[in-house]
């Protein structure tokens, strides 16, 4: 569960580097709420921004010096200019970042392992999806703890594309986006990764996928509701407002009873989907292949 929305879905290494940086080079980003931890990520009082973006509106955000250009070509030009000017990274800084990266990788590997006797966790699910992805595959996430886990634990691979949409949490984007990716001609597997709360907001897009004959893989995580928002509400207000799939408690009159027994696989099957249930990393790998 998340505690609030003032944190960013980056690795710990990247977050600490951003906290100290006096210059941020923003490449193709809208510097939105989730990316910047609601603008709390950058702690240096003298921080300045340079933004490379094809969209002029986004290029000016945070008072950045805008470079309206293709990201790859702009970076090539900047690298040539930096070399010509004699710009070099500080040796001490490189050592510091290397140590932070090593520490983060150790944490990520631990988060990706399933603990014996415990339910399949978000970190393990995101790690398995990343490990099973092959060149040509597309992974889509857009909201909640799935979005954060996918972003933090993904390992870059040639030809594997992550499409993560999060100006704010964008529940219901995932399945529709997966259909769009398939219709656009992507040849590999297309995986939509979402929680049960987001799934229940728009499961009928499975019917659209069926109608269009678009083969997609939908990984629905049983979170018993909107746990990211639950965490935010508990942190900010000290109580939640019915964001978990619980029965109403007769004494308190609140939705604080037992978790509801909901069969999401049966729901998806009723709309034409082939379904598998996975309670372990091994079962999830098998379902994905």
Predicted regions and their residues:
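Structural motif
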Residues: 23, 138, 189-191
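Glycine-rich, acidic loop regions that bind phosphate or pyrophosphate groups
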Residues: 2-97, 218, 233
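Generic structural signal for well-ordered, non-membrane alpha-helical segments
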Residues: 11-18, 67-71, 75, 90-97, ...
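Glycine-rich, N-terminal phosphate-binding loop of Rossmann-like dinucleotide-binding domains
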Residues: 27-28, 143, 194
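Active-site glycine- and acidic-residue-rich loops that bind
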Residues: 32, 118-123, 198-201
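Active-site diphosphate/adenylate-binding microenvironment
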Residues: 1, 99-176, 181-182
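Thiamine diphosphate
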Residues: 18, 59-60, 68, 75-76, ...
């Amino acid at each position: 569960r998340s505690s609030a929305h003032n944190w960013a879905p980056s690795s710990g290494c990247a977050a600490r580097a951003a906290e100290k940086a006096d210059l941020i080079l923003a490449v193709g980003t809208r510097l939105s709420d989730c990316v910047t931890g609601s603008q709390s990520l950058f702690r240096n009082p003298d921080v300045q921004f340079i933004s490379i973006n094809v969209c002029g509106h986004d290029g000016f955000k945070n008072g950045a010096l805008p470079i309206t250009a293709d990201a790859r070509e702009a970076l090539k030009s900047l690298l040539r200019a930096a070399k010509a000017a004699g710009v070099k990274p500080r040796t001490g800084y490189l050592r510091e970042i290397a140590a932070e990266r090593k520490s983060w990788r150790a944490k990520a590997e631990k988060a990706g392992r399933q603990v014996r006797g415990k339910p399949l966790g978000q970190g393990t699910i995101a790690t398995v999806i990343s490990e099973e992805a092959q060149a040509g595959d597309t992974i889509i996430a857009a909201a909640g703890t799935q979005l954060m886990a996918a972003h933090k634990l993904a390992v870059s691979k040639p030809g594997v594309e992550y499409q993560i949409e999060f100006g704010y949490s964008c529940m219901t984007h995932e399945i529709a986006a997966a259909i769009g990716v398939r219709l656009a001609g992507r040849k590999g597997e297309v995986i939509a990764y979402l929680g049960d709360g987001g799934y229940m907001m728009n499961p009928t897009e499975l019917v659209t996928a069926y109608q269009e004959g678009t083969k997609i893989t939908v990984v629905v995580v049983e979170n018993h509701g909107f746990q990211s928002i639950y965490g935010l509400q508990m942190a900010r207000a000290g109580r939640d407002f019915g964001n978990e799939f619980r029965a109403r408690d007769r004494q308190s009159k609140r939705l604080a009873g037992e978790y509801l027994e909901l069969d999401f696989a049966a729901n998806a099957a009723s709309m034409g989907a082939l379904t598998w249930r996975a309670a372990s990393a091994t079962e999830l790998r098998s379902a994905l292949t």
